[in-house]
Each structure stands twice: as C-alpha cells, then as structure tokens.
C-alpha cells in the first residue's frame, strides 16, 4: 500500500487536551478517584508497594481550578487541533469503512465484559452504549486504547517488581473522561505514566474557523459542531542511565457536520530517547516499528521515521530529542477501517519494541558520571517539551490550565550545567553525533 504526505501536520490538539503526551487529569468534583491498582489477572498479596500519594491521589481542594483545566483542555483541542502543517495519508483513499455483515457483532455481551475485566478500569463509555454500537469506530478505538493501556501497565509493573500503578479515573463535565495510570519512584522506573482519554462535546466557533482555514468545509447546526476525541499516550523515564526513555501516543478524532457528514482522522507515534547509544537497542526498536508499518505498506515506515526525526528537533541545540521512531498525523486514508488497523498494529508494537530493552539494561551497573550525563540529557527532554511542543506551550499560556497535568511528561529530575561539553570520542559524544545526524537503523 502506497503512502502520500501532503500539507497539514503535528498533533498539538491531543496534548492540549491531555496535558502533553496524554497526562491530563481533567477535573470535575467527580474525578478525584485515584486508587492503587492491582493489575488485571492477579490476585492475592503482591510484592509491589502501592503509591497512593502525590497530586494524582489527592481530591478535595482545587476543584475549581481543575474544572477550569478541563475547559482549558477543550479550548486547547479547539485552538490547536486544526493548526497542522503536515498530513499523513495512505492511498488510494476509499469512500469510507467497510459495511459490516448483516447481524454481525464484534463482541457479544459476555465477550465484551470479559475484555473489559482485563482493563485498568472500566471503560469511559458505558457498556450498554458500547454494546449498542459494536461496529462504530468510537467503540473499536476506545476498546483498543483501553487494552493498550492495560498491556503496557502490566508489562511495566512486571519489570519494576516493586511499585504499583496508581489509577486515577476522571470525568469531564462536558462529556467523557479518562483514566490516568502513574507509577512513580519504583525500582526500575523513575516515572511512568500511561493515560487514556475519551472526550466529546461541541467545538467552539474558533475551532471550526481554524478547521475551515485548513481546507475543510464544515456545516454547523445552531453554530455547533459535535466532536469526539480519544487516545492512549505514555511517557516512561527509567532510573538506570542505560535504559532509555520512551514515549508513544495513538489517537482518533472526528467532527460531525449538521448534515451528518463526519470528518475523521488518526494520529500518533512512538519514539525512543536513550542517554547512551546502544546500536543493538536502536536497531531492535526501529526494526520492530518497521515490521509493524510494513504490514500496511512498504513506504510507510521511512516517511513516518523522517517525520519523527523532523518533529522532535531541538532547534536551539541543533539536535533531536532522541533517536526517533515513527510519527504521523491526520491519517484519513485509504479507509477508516484500514487506518484503524494500522494504528492498532502500531499500538501492539509498543511493548515488544521497548520492554526487552528495559529488561536488558535496568540492572546495568553505572557510575556517577553516567548518572550526571543522564540528568543533562533529561534537561534536553525538558527543553523540547517546554519550548517546542505545541500542546505544552498552549497549555502553559492558557489561564486556568492544570499545570500538574501539563508537566507530568517531564522527568522527576534533570540538570543543566554551564557550557557543558563531553570529551571528544567519548560515549557521551557518540550519542550526540546520532542526535545531530539521524541514522537509518534498519538497512
């Protein structure tokens, strides 16, 4: 399957809603429901310790601010969702999703309940509604992101062996909600967050105008445009300098016009940020993503790999945030079903692309010098997120935004030193060379 790139571009809208990399804990008085999660499929006492503290575990005060953050998140979606500069498209484009066979249901009631029992929490959408529309893309995507969250959390908790995920389920007054899972200060992971969000409502007139400016003709009814946005996102910061940071995000968005016509698209990506370069790890990560992409077309991986290298560029440093991966947005072809299958395949590649690398290095010995370099590289991670990530910038400059949610993608610790430069031909200099000149890792 061929793939074509056109004009349009990045994904600030989703991070504006989710607080960058889906870390939003939007709030209403009903959303302070944090708990320590026992992973699905486990029973009895666990050797890990629960983390029932920190901003994710507190309710009570500040609910007015949290409600404002929810509204700011919607404003973020409206203002940023449609400011793209690039677009992904798999061609040829068909007229839409395949029609389901008469009487066919993706899940019967018992099977749906079984699937949901493996999630970190019950779905945002009520089960009766999911059963009512089994072939609707909103149902398929919500179940997929819930499964992805559970799979990633289960894998990370197993690797850590000490800390549990705190599960924070929140509801959005205007419609929808989400589940934020956080593991912090564990044995292996300094900070790991895996979050899903399913929100819906009406786009503002400002958002509609920005979307029209992008070339989409939208017909409003009573000045309203119903929308649905959902996705899963994660950022993972291990403690060991030889275990890399990883981020992924997969999302779906649709807007319904007055005449019933729906505009829809998918976006997402997965990227790796090592402190020290390990050629074998880089090849494994990129090869796993390439194998996922190749199931849907031989031209997809190289285009999305380049898009990732270009997006995660720290201009003032002249280097990338990491060694890349894949990145795409506004994917609306060749059909809704095929685009969904592609996104699902990519999401399924998250655990096999990353967890073996963490297992390999989580117990590596390291020196104070290694840890210092990790902290300096974490500083670069912070610089990109605060200075260049559109969703983060929008949230920080939006009155009433929930800062804890916006900054949750940042590591617990980072460092800056004046005029720091690693010795020539050192292992620190080796990673800088790759960050300044991206490599082809799979050929």
UniProtKB/Swiss-Prot annotation:
Ranges of Basic and acidic residues composition bias in the record: 103-112
SUPFAM superfamilies cross-referenced by the UniProt entry: Coproporphyrinogen III oxidase
Location (main, coarse): mitochondrion
Annotated positions for site Important for dimerization: 316
UniProt GO MF annotations: coproporphyrinogen oxidase activity; P-type sodium:potassium-exchanging transporter activity; protein homodimerization activity; structural constituent of eye lens
Annotated EC: 1.3.3.3
Residues binding coproporphyrinogen III, per UniProt: 233, 249-251, 400-402
Annotated stretches, region: Important for dimerization: 182-191, 381-417
The keyword Transit peptide appears for this protein: yes
Family affiliation: Belongs to the aerobic coproporphyrinogen-III oxidase family.
The protein's name in its UniProt record: Oxygen-dependent coproporphyrinogen-III oxidase, mitochondrial
Origin species: Mus musculus
Chain's gene name: Cpox
């Amino acid at each position: 399957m061929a793939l074509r790139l056109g004009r349009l571009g990045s994904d600030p809208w989703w991070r504006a809603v989710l607080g960058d990399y889906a870390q939003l804990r939007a709030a209403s008085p009903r959303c302070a429901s944090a708990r320590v999660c026992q992973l699905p499929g486990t029973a009895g006492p666990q050797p890990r310790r629960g983390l029932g503290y920190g901003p994710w575990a507190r309710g009570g005060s500040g609910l007015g601010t949290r409600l404002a953050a929810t509204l700011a998140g919607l404003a973020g979606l409206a203002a940023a969702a449609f400011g793209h500069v690039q677009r992904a498209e798999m061609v040829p484009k068909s007229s839409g999703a395949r029609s389901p066979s008469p009487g066919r249901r993706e899940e019967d009631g018992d099977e749906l309940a079984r699937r949901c029992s493996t999630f970190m929490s019950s779905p945002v959408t009520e089960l009766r509604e999911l059963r009512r529309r089994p072939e609707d893309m909103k149902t398929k995507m919500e179940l997929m992101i819930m499964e992805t969250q559970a799979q990633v959390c289960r894998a990370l908790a197993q690797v850590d062996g000490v800390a549990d995920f705190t599960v924070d389920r929140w509801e959005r007054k205007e419609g929808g909600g989400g589940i934020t899972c956080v593991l912090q200060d564990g044995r292996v992971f300094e900070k790991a967050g895996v979050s899903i969000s399913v929100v819906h409502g009406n786009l503002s007139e400002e958002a509609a105008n920005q979307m029209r400016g992008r070339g989409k003709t939208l017909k409003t009814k009573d000045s309203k445009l119903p929308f649905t946005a959902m996705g899963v996102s994660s950022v993972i910061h291990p403690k060991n300098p030889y275990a890399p940071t990883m981020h992924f995000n997969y999302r779906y968005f649709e807007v319904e016009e007055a005449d019933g016509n729906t505009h829809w698209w998918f976006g997402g990506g997965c990227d790796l940020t090592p402190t020290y370069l390990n050629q074998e790890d880089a090849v494994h990560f990129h090869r796993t993503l390439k194998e996922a992409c190749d199931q849907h077309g031989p031209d997809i991986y190289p285009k999305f790999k380049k898009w990732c290298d270009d997006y995660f560029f720290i201009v003032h440093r002249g280097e990338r945030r990491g060694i890349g991966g894949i990145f795409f947005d506004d994917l609306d072809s060749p059909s809704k079903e095929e685009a969904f299958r592609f996104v699902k395949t990519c999401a399924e590649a998250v655990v096999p692309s990353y967890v073996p690398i963490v297992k390999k290095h989580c117990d590596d010995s390291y020196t104070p010098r290694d840890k210092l370099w990790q902290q300096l590289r974490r500083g670069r991670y912070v610089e990109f997120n605060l200075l260049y990530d559109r969703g983060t910038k929008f949230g920080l400059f939006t009155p009433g935004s929930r800062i804890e949610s916006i900054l949750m993608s940042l590591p617990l610790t980072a460092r800056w030193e004046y005029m720091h430069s690693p010795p020539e031909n050192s292992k620190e200099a080796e990673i800088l060379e790759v960050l300044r000149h991206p490599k082809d890792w799979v050929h």
